[in-house]
Amino acid sequence: MAFTEANEREVQSSYEKENVKIIREEEAKDQESTDDIAVEDGTGTSPDLNFFSTQNVMQMNFEDEYSEFSNEDDEAEIDNSFADSIPNEPEIPDMQDEYSRDSHSQQSVEEQNNTTNTDEDASVNEFSVAADISDVNTLGKDNSESTEEPVNEVNETATLGNEDVGERSGFPSEGLDNEPESQRDLDETGNLAPEDLKDEVKSVHEFNEPNDLRQQEESYSDDDDTNVNEFEDVNEIENEHQLSVADEDQTSRLVKGKMIFVGKEDFGEEADISNSVFIEQNGPNSDTVSGFKETSSIVNSSSTTEKPGVALDSQNDTSIFNEEQTNSLTETFNDLTLDHLPENVESEPVAGKENETAKNESGASDNDHKANVHVFVLKSSEDAITLNEEKIATQDDPLEAPTPIVASSSTIFLNSNQRNDELSASGSQEPHPKDGTNSTSSLPLDTNNLSNSEPPSHVLDASSETIEVIQTIKKLQNQVPETIKDEVGKKNTAFSPGTSLSTNHVKTKSRSAHNNSTSPFSTAVSSWLNPLRYPSDKSPRVISSYLESVFISKPRSIGDAQKLEILEYLQSQSSTVSNQVFTLLSNFIQNPLFVLDECFDEFRNLILMHNSHTVHTVVWKTISSWTSYDYEMQYSSLSIKNCDSDKAIRKDLDRTFAPEILSHFFSNRQQLEPTDNIAESTANLHRVLRSLAIVLPQVGYTQGMSWIAGALLMHLPAPQAFALLVFLFKNYHLQNIFSSEMRGLSRVLHQFTRLVEDYMPSLAIHFKRQDIKTCSYASEWFLTLFAYKFPLEVVAHLYDILFLYGPGILFNFGLALLSHSQESLLKLNMDRLISYLKEDIFLAFKETQEGENYDTSLFVKTAFSFEIQPDVLDRYGNEYDILLKSEHELDSSLEEMRNRHKSLNEHFIMLSDSMANLQVEHENMSALLLKEKMYLKNQTVEQASLKSEIASLNSQLAKQKSEIEQAFQGDMEAIIAENLEIMVESQSLEDEIFRKEKQLAETKVNLAVLDEDHMMALQKWSQLMNRIKTK
């Protein structure tokens, strides 16, 4: 359907832009005069974009095709939603968003609807529709000819909505030519042939390429005959470029996700998307045109049906799904479980109207066209998740061997750094017990929200490998056959929370027939901690307990001699156990991993319910031999060495155990020799503790270790007791609670305190009011592993459970003690409360007040009634780490402030001394100043008197001068005259002296001449005499 120039002036600006874009494409490709004429007439259309706009669809006569809609409101609603029902409309994503932003859009639609009937005939004559409404709908039912065509490009445009809430989305699908129906190549069912459909899809994508966009921009610069003004053309090019970029981005995301989103056309900021659905193609032919048609036929039906998430046209001849497709979707949906869905996502079945004609004409087998479609109804905007295409395997399909699942253990005594070091040293992840020994949640406990797809964090640290394990679990669960998933609900209720202990249990079978047993104390978490087993030898090993995880993390084997030794002991004690227990223990000695994996239920029930001394010894001997045999060999050399802790060990042993208890520490009672005595038992215990201090020098010896070693020596020889003690410290991380600063113990006590607040808030408040700290009563529980007050026979039973479930079970033991005596504790005050917690709380589990036997089964049942989820333990542990870090920071700040205060105090003292000295000096200077001021005042008075005296003296002097001058004036004149005479006489005498001096000088000269002549005469004489003598 197209529009004339008269209609074009009435249509909104967005529709004019579309026509201009189509005209420019034809001009760029053909450059023919006929195209120029088409542009001038405004009737040029692209064969690929005949249904490009929803406005074209809205021009159809709805009264002819949908006669049941007579109400004007219904017609307006159809105008807004009918474009959604076109499954193959090749519209660029987000184009509807651009249209919705046009301020004249609503007005243009109303004008368009008013002129539909009058202009329909002329419009059909100029531009005929490629297919009517029924032909458009039948595109969703192409079953046979189109099943082998690839849809890589189709999937890119097969987006019927926008996954981003708050944005409107276009509804791309296959385009239809504007040729008459008689000229189109149609298959037998009346649908487009696969070749035509592929060509149309290709043309749509060619039109959306950036090169075509640049060509359109170039052609736009040469277009002088357009009937749209220049301003609108420029805006059209910019919008076209933005839409192309958005289209490429969205289609690339859809191709990666293999997903088709079906939803409402309008996604405003306040839009309700509760009826929107995701459709995931999981069938074997999901990459075909048929698969695309099947899924793209599901449309939103908010205006035509009341069922959310499903679009049905009950009055139209054509149906959205044929019978086979509907059955396929229904069966697929019924097979889905909530394990595949998040908590806030529900599944909705998809139904369609049967179409027998389309079914008979398709001629395709079920496997050629069926596609498993998952429909998830979104309940909130946060539920918009991408569903990756994964094939749901059937029972006959072998599963590919994934990476073995090794769940991490609840290392309750490890902080983040220690856990990283532990993982680095072991080179693998620490497994976690299948029965969820550490699962806990804050009250009230809501187990309905837990599912296999949402495993809890099972370690105490944010740096753990939880994310990797969760991803592996999710991947494997998506591959689990439906028949196997049905077996998840089978649970062993022998030790379920709230049930009484009994010997009834379901025997665990081989891997091919898995029975997901329930955790003895955590029903909610066991559904994840008990992973599914698979009917194939390639299935991963399933971690059933903490003990099994330890065996897996440190695989080794022992010699036949060690096995024979334990078997001989078991044989010697065969009278104390039943045949079934004897067989189970024999198998455990031969291969512990086999028993823990294949016979876990039987072994668990034996550990929880037995009261045989033989079971303790056999199980402990086996664990020691399989895990720590090297330490057994080293014991003889270590026990004779000296260490720094000898003195502390000897001092502690003398005050810890009674003599009758020490006599039991040399092996077990059946192995006592007549020569054994208390001294030898004490020395034996001393050697074990000393060897442990040598092996673990960073731990050394701490009070409480002797209780653990003593309990082990009750049932094991010293070498095996030492090896098992090292095993506990290294693999169960007890070395952290015995560290020098007891940081691990403080961390455990903090976690235990928070658990008491969760499960027994009234008791926690009572402790708070009575100022009872957890460390005042629970420290010895964890330091001695509850061996401090319980009889050692009961302690041995608790150690069996500890070995099986890991250190997390200690929290359950502590909660069991408090819970069983909660009413009594609430009635006691502070002094009596401390005494009760230290002494009498253990007596509450006695079978009778006068007897010595303890009801171990009641204690175990009470302990297993608490569901302690690991993520809560993680949170409490991390909470302590944060508090400890904050405390360290505060301590550092406090120490810095103390040092600062000390330096400032010293400076203050120095300044105070200086100030005192200056004060004394100031006082002295003040006294001196006062003295000087007085002296100055006296001097001023004296000066004034002296000045007056000077003045009088000066006047007297002047008077005396005048008198003297007058008295001696005549004498002076006589003296002056006499002086003149003397001066004249003196002058004459000086002249006489000058003449005499001159005469004397002349005489001296004459004398010199005479002396020279005399010398000459003497020389001559001498010469004469010499001559005379020579002659």
UniProtKB/Swiss-Prot annotation:
Q: Which cellular component terms (GO) are annotated to the entry?
A: cytosol; Golgi-associated vesicle; plasma membrane
Comp. bias regions, Acidic residues: 62-78, 219-229
Q: Which GO terms describe its molecular function?
A: GTPase activator activity
- Rab-GAP TBC domain location: 610-806
Keyword annotations:
Cytoplasm, ER-Golgi transport, Exocytosis, GTPase activation, Membrane, Protein transport, Transmembrane, Transmembrane helix, Transport
Per its UniProt record, what InterPro entries does this chain match? Rab-GAP-TBC_dom (IPR000195), Rab-GAP_TBC_sf (IPR035969), Rab_GAP_TBC_domain (IPR050302)
The residue ranges flagged as biased composition, category Basic and acidic residues, are 1-32, 195-217
Q: Where in the cell is it found?
A: Membrane; Cytoplasm
Q: Does the keyword Protein transport apply?
A: yes
Mind telling me which residue stretches traverse the membrane in this protein? 798-818
**Chain segments carrying region Disordered:** 1-229, 278-317, 339-371, 420-459, 490-520
Kindly indicate whether the keyword Glycoprotein belongs to this entry: no
Chief location: membrane
Q: What does this protein do?
A: GTPase-activating protein involved in ER to Golgi trafficking and polarized exocytosis.
State the family named in the UniProt similarity comment for this chain: Belongs to the GYP5 family.
Q: What is this protein called?
A: GTPase activating protein Gyp51
The source organism is Schizosaccharomyces pombe (strain 972 / ATCC 24843)
Q: In the UniProt record, what gene is named as encoding this protein?
A: gyp51
